């Protein structure tokens, strides 16, 4: 009788230990997945595509940074731009304020990016190191987290 009781206690103890270990592994895995998503704020987002079309390589890659104070800044490829934004859970509203007006060679990408900055963004999505800005019709621009050049 005593051996059966000890055996049952041992089995229950092992089951509890296995359950705790599996729970800890799942929690660690979930934390790792969540940690892989870059934050919207203070990440150097490099433009990858506009309306589903990849942009060509440029000397200065078009980019945007959303700052903690509610402002955004970036480079169109030649000119710099700035404005304000408001964000909540997966929601974003951007107010473009202005840009410099230097004349540069091949401003096709710059004009396309600038035109889209005037879109009425409503949502954003971050999947690991990819930022997607969306309007009411879906994806407008896609960015990847890059390294800001010095």
Regions found by a protein language model. Give the residues of each.
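Bacterial N-terminal signal peptides that target proteins for export
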Residues: 2-12
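Lipid interaction determinants
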Residues: 5-7, 21-150
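Bacterial N-terminal signal peptides
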Residues: 11-21
């Amino acid at each position: 009788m005593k051996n059966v009781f000890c055996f049952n206690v041992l089995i229950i103890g092992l089951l509890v230990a296995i359950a705790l270990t599996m729970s800890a592994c799942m929690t660690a895995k979930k934390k790792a997945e969540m940690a892989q998503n870059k934050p919207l704020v203070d990440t150097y987002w490099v433009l990858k595509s506009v309306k589903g079309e990849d942009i060509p390589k440029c000397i200065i890659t078009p980019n945007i940074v959303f700052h903690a104070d509610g402002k955004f800044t970036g480079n169109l490829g030649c000119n710099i731009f700035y404005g304000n934004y408001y964000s909540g859970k997966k929601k974003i509203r951007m107010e473009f304020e202005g840009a410099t007006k230097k004349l540069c060679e091949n401003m096709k990408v710059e004009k396309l990016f600038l035109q889209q900055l005037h879109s009425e963004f409503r949502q954003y999505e971050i999947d690991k190191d990819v930022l997607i800005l969306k309007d009411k019709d879906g994806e407008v621009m896609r960015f990847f987290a890059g390294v800001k050049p010095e």
